[in-house]
A protein has these predicted regions:
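Loop-to-transmembrane helix boundary motifs in multi-pass membrane proteins
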Residues: 164-167, 202-206, 322, 367, ...
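Transmembrane alpha-helical segments of multi-pass small-molecule transport proteins
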Residues: 171-172, 196-218, 234-243, 411-425, ...
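Juxtamembrane transmembrane-helix boundary signature
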Residues: 101, 128-161, 169-183
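Hydrophobic alpha-helical segments and their helix-loop junctions in multi-pass secondary transporters
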Residues: 233-260, 277-291, 457-466, 491-503
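Hydrophobic transmembrane alpha-helices that form the core helical bundles
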Residues: 145, 149, 167-198, 205-209, ...
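Extracellular/periplasmic helix-exit of transmembrane alpha-helices
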Residues: 135-149, 289-297, 325-355
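Flexible loop linkers connecting adjacent transmembrane helices
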Residues: 113-116, 141-166, 191-193, 298-301, ...
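Short helix-start
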Residues: 2, 6-10, 14, 29-36, ...
Length: 504
């Protein structure tokens, strides 16, 4: 915080404390004109009029003067100080749902996809890391904006706006796809530990699953969110690995800046898979719900939220841009590593992230392989609870259950049951010999179909003034959002056609 900002914060906080102290005295009148508020507390009439117009301060017109009640002024002073605390927090402290959402996008299954396209096509698809960034950001900013403004989760808003009959099949598809992804990620985490330590697969898998379930179920939200933020640091392993393998940086820059497209089934399918891995439904529900969790944790939920919303939207945008930027930098780093090491040595078949880590060892050395492996496990610890949580939030809102990681298990039994069952089924997929990696193909199809439908609803709601009021999304966000929706819809159609024609 700068010196000027610190002084501003100190003065405003002192004013709010004085308002609360004065208004707490019983001898004070119940109502004040704006002129009286200005004289007593130094708030300009123009500022008071703005607060009243935006709904941050409740005021009424009486006898030609604007009047504010003692209760309304007290509520504003209390709310305002909490908003000030958010506004003047350091940038790193304001990072939360957006950062965690972006980091969880690079889950072990996603790492497997990015490694596969890097090994098979080299740097030919590296440009997607740059060109998908504004579209991905537009989607995530809009879902977060909807939750901050409406104070409700995405599933709840879509259900009330378009009907639960429309929403329910989408949520069921989300649950199925998330559970398969959880199974694949748990398996990849256990396999990655086997590359580092002399451990057995099954006991390691069970231990990891139980550990995640206990953390997500019993650790208070504010502590758990802090753990997830630190786990995001595991993504640095991929950036370091990309530097260690010494790629041709001129070729990298050229591939990122200039799009390359091949009109054959395999290349188009790889583009579709990359888009589906990068812009995926569980991220929508997770960030939407975690924005609410953050506001509850900071106590900035309430009826007169216009002043808080303006600040929270600014903080959310910085958080979301940081998270999505990190996600796509890591996507690019993984493609660079796979293209430079695996593809360059003729290794084009990569079935999972753990097999990629094993293949790196003889080609790039122990250090690069160990970094890649640590990244798989660390990001898995972040992504698996995010997927399970996204399923729980979506289903709880459909059925009207109590929800939230800020609640205890006894307060939201249905919500936590979905988390535990999702993890248990993911565990069972591995223990029963069902290959979750193969099942990921069908999960990708589900996600590819569900995503554009959800995005259509998201951007319709995000631009609806009846729902969003003065806080509809900026025009640039709407443009990139609709471009993403059209591209994802077209990708889903291409995927269906490729399947129907039996294309590889």
């Amino acid at each position: 915080m700068s010196k000027a900002a610190a002084l501003s914060f100190s003065a405003l906080a002192k004013r709010n404390r004085r308002i609360r102290a004065v208004l707490s005295e019983q001898r004070e009148p119940d109502r004040f004109t704006f002129e009286e508020v200005r004289e007593r507390f130094g708030i300009p009439v123009r500022k008071l009029a703005y607060l009243a117009r935006t709904g941050a301060l409740e005021a009424t017109a009486e006898g030609g003067s604007l009047v504010v009640s003692r209760e309304a002024l007290l509520a504003y002073a209390s709310q305002s100080e909490r908003v000030l605390q958010v506004r003047h927090s350091s940038f790193l402290k304001t990072l939360g749902p957006g950062l965690i959402t972006g980091a969880s996008d690079d889950d072990p299954s996603g790492i497997g996809t990015y490694t596969s396209i890097g090994a098979l096509y080299g740097l030919a698809l590296a440009w997607l890391a740059l060109y998908l960034l504004p579209m991905m950001t537009a989607v995530q900013e809009t879902v977060a904006r909807i939750s901050i403004v409406t104070q409700r989760g995405l599933s709840s808003v879509i259900g009330d706006t378009y009907g639960k009959k429309v929403l329910f099949p989408l949520v069921v598809a989300l649950l199925v796809a998330n559970t398969v992804n959880i199974g694949a990620d748990l398996g990849a985490m256990a396999a990655s530990l086997q590359l580092l330590l002399p451990v057995e697969f099954a006991p390691t898998l069970v231990t990891v699953t139980v550990g995640i379930a206990l953390l997500e179920t019993f650790v208070p939200y504010h502590r758990y969110a802090r753990i997830l933020k630190w786990l995001a640091a595991a993504l640095l392993a991929y950036v370091v690995t990309a530097v260690v393998v010494k790629p041709d940086w001129f070729s990298v820059l050229r591939s990122v800046a200039v799009p390359h497209v091949e009109f054959n089934a395999g290349f188009v399918a790889a583009m579709v898979a990359t888009m589906g891995t990068t812009i995926t439904p569980y991220l929508f529900f997770w960030q939407s719900s975690e924005e609410l969790e953050e506001k509850k944790d900071r106590h900035t939920m309430g009826e007169r939220r216009a002043a808080a919303v303006a600040v929270e939207l600014r903080e959310m945008r910085k958080d979301t841009y940081a998270g999505m930027g990190i996600a796509n930098i890591v996507f690019l780093a993984i493609v660079i590593t796979a293209a430079t090491v695996l593809g360059a040595h003729g290794i084009t078949e990569v079935s999972s992230a753990s097999t990629a880590a094993a293949a790196l060892k003889p080609l790039a050395g122990d250090f690069a392989s160990a970094l890649f492996t640590i990244g798989i496990f660390g990001v898995g610890l972040l992504a698996v609870p995010v997927m399970a949580g996204a399923s729980a939030y979506a289903l709880a809102e459909v059925f009207g259950w109590k929800e939230g990681l800020g609640r205890k298990v006894r307060q939201a039994p249905g919500f936590y049951a979905v988390i535990v069952v999702s993890l248990a089924v993911g565990l069972a997929l591995n223990l029963l010999g069902i290959d979750p990696i193969k099942a990921l193909y069908y999960a990708a199809i589900l996600n590819g179909i569900v995503a554009p439908i959800l995005m259509f609803f998201i951007f319709r709601i995000g631009s609806n003034k009846k729902i969003m009021g003065q806080f509809t999304g900026p025009w640039a966000i709407r443009v990139f959002g609709w471009i993403a929706t059209v591209l994802m819809g077209a990708s889903a159609l291409v995927l269906v056609v490729l399947m129907a024609t039996g294309a590889p």
